[in-house]
Amino acid sequence: MSQPLDTLWYTRCPVPTGLGIAVQKGWLEQALGDQGTRIQSLRESDNQAVRESHFDHSLQNSVRHGGSIPAIWARASGRETRVIGLSWADEVQLILSLPDSGIRNVKDLKGRRFGLPDWAGAQIDFTRAQAIRGLENALKLEGLEVQDVERVDFRQGGTFSDETPHSIAGLGAFGGRRRGGQNPELTGLLRGEVDAIFLKGAHAVQLAQQFGLHTVIDTGSHPEPLIRSNNGTPRTLSVDQHLLDTHFDTAVGILGSVLRAEEWAQAHPEDTRRYLARESNSSEYWVAQAYGEDAHQRLRTNLDERSIAALQDFTDFLRRWNFIPQGFAVRDWIDPRPLEALRSAVAKRAG
């Protein structure tokens, strides 16, 4: 039997998610407030160990909606978590070069220097993993492998959760204002230390335009889903096992607020772009460039077969590159009961 929960910790990545909109609209707080549960932002905590749970999901009674790499790593490392939803919002995934580098297409990458971030102090370096994934997917389209390029690492000290959140006018940047910036490989590209790099999302298109970079390929627009599959495709909505076992109604309430936000987004494209711009610390223009003018229609959390297959393929990739200690069956990680409970409730109301 579900027991009342005092506090739910929530976190989401600075990317398009239904949870992010549900938080901004107050719907998560409303849904759980009716159960006597208050919500608290994990990312805004002054405690570094609490903020680190965004990556290792160590905090009990917490929900996370965002990039799948940390969630997969946590599961592979023994964290008792379950996925209750998957969302697939395609985004730009760019391999970029300087315009005078001579790199015009993927074939031209052979034998060239490719810059990779290297957060050696992080439990899971999701930035490195997603860059290698983007590179590998691009190269395989031309019969090439990652070994066909020269990898150049850009070491970054500390972890992703070291800095306390920095906020202006209610808008925060997760990770604070890190000395040296968040993309040392971009600096390396501009200095001529490497020939190409990988960036994705709203900031990728903004930086590419600002610095006049050449887009070698956008794997995020490829017609094959497994080529587009990366950290954000699909994204995972995950909770800890204790929350499911002890506070099942809370898990259902979380998912219900996410689906409510996504349904609202379908009918409110302009408002949705504004919310997504706030979520991604970007502007509405760059959100449209990165996630499409139909970004409001891409917010769909479910458990469809395409997403499950892509998540398994991505998990296998992470194991092959030793980003996770062991592989596992994604289907065993998924708990469909909260989604089934919501659908059953809708059917009863309709009947």
What is the role of each PLM region?
Residues I69, F160-L276:
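Pocket-lining segment of extracytoplasmic ligand-binding domains
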Residues D34-L42, G143-R151, S280-G292, I324-D332:
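Short, surface-exposed acidic
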Residues R82-A89, E150-F154, G212-N231, A329:
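Short beta-strand->loop
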Residues M1-D6, K348-G351:
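Short, low-complexity disordered leader/linker segments with a strong preference
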Residues H247-F323:
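Secondary-structure end/capping motifs
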Residues Q30-G33, P223-I227, R298-R306:
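Short, solvent-exposed loop/beta-turn-alpha elements that line the ligand-binding surface or hinge
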Residues L318-G351:
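Conserved C-terminal helix/tail region of periplasmic/extracytoplasmic solute-binding proteins
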Residues P4-Q147, R151-R155, D162:
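Short, glycine-/small- and polar/acidic-enriched structural segments
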